[in-house]
Amino acid sequence: MYFGVQMYGVSKEWKQDPEGFLKKIYEAGYRQIEPCLGFRVDARDYGFWIPEDLEQAMPLLAKYHIEVHAVHIFLDEYHYEREFAILTELAQKYHISWFVVKSPARLTKDVLDETAARYRELAEELEKAGAGLLIHNEKEDICIRVNGKTAYEYLLEACGEKVGAEVDAGWMYCGGVDPEEFLWAHADRVKAV
């Protein structure tokens, strides 16, 4: 198993010295990074990348044998269809296995059901490009209950088997759920931690 670095939390170090950063994480044993991509707004000052940043980073990543298997994506919750072509191209060009989304801002049953339908559609489109879709939890979707489950569990189940889980154990713990218990209970859905 390889461990990767979520680039959001180390964006300052990356910006200051990309090559020095990659050398340091390579020496520490990391072989993957997971950037956060935005599409509609340039939020690079807040730790996000745009697709062009990924392209520019690839030669340096290759030099240090660092791969990108998963990418967090921040899309318009209701109109992400515009990004299908971009996501497909990224999956094929860079061999990205997983695109990672989060729960919607509003965690009501109706909104979660609507989101699940959109995520199923997105997962089907990504599957055509050889990639999959994962949902990353945050504290709020663990704290809020829907039909007796965490909002995160409810959304995962509503999405069906084509959508997997990327578990943030820290947020899960902060939300009051034992991460180990969750991982064992949902081992078939968890693709990344």
Each language-model region and where it sits:
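N-terminal pre-domain/capping segments
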Residues: 1-93, 97
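Active-site beta-loop-alpha junctions enriched in small/polar residues
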Residues: 6-10, 36-40, 73-76, 103-106, ...
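Charged helix-capping and loop-helix junction motifs
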Residues: 19, 47-56, 81-86, 112-120, ...
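Surface-exposed amphipathic alpha-helices with a cationic face
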Residues: 26, 58, 62, 120-127, ...
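A local structural micro-motif
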Residues: 33-34, 69, 99, 134, ...
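Helix C-cap/helix->beta junction micro-motif
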Residues: 63-64, 94, 122, 128-129, ...
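Hydrophobic alpha-helical segments and helix pairs
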Residues: 89-109, 119, 126-127
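Acidic/histidine-rich catalytic cores of soluble enzymes
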Residues: 126-193
